[in-house]
Amino acid sequence: MTLLYLVRHGETIDNVHRIMQGQTQGELNEKGLKQAQEVAEQLKNEPIDAFVSSDLRRSIHTCEIIAAPHHQPVRITPLLRERDWGAFTGKYIPDLSNLKNPALWPKDIESIDAIKARAAEFIAWLRTEYPNQKVLAVGHGIINKAIQSVYYDKPMNEILPMSNAEIRMLEL
């Protein structure tokens, strides 16, 4: 069994400004840096075998901070990348009046089926690459929700959103 510490990246400048980040790099703000340091402190004595991050800067930075006390490298994978929000990327979220109605969304947004397929691929990859190990993975709000949706075999809307720098444990 692989034990997964699933973490969402620390707070970013765009989180605060309510900008749809999607697959943009993003930068941690002061609070986000502090959140990552708090997770590092909380887990510094946990025997974690590997650290994995999305290939987006906000997650890499969070993961590097958490991994530092363990003196371990961070492995990067695009499987943990946030949902591609297409034409919504970079937009002010409150201005997206049709956000609650997917039928009205632009056609270039990554589908739920596609993101869940990526989440399933990530879980399979972890089981293969890190059998019987403890792995900390830093991702994003929607991909982390998709991973949990696949893991628990529940619709994504039944998975509670993760706060910035929140940790959830999954036994794979």
Give residue spans per PLM region.
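Short active-site segment of divalent metal-dependent hydrolases/proteases
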Residues: 12, 143-144
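Phosphate-handling substructures
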Residues: 68-120, 124, 160
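Domain-level recognition of soluble alpha/beta enzyme cores
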Residues: 152-172
